[in-house]
Amino acid sequence: MQALQTFNFKELPVRTVEIENEPYFVGKDIAEILGYARADNAIRNHVDSEDKLTHQFSASGQNRNMIIINESGLYSLIF
């Protein structure tokens, strides 16, 4: 399991992970930065299924499932 890396975009955190040499972004982080009121709805309505994965991460001793999106999914949320 890859570890999350956190970057800041205009002082807001963006969590990323690399899977098979491709960057993926935590969808919730991107949707919130872009101003979507409901991140889960934005990802469901705008990102194609082939551009998102549910990935399990371990944080603070707990496993959490997060929706991560690839670069194409990122552009789907932007445009």
Language model segments and positions:
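An anion-engaging/catalytic patch
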Residues: M1-F79
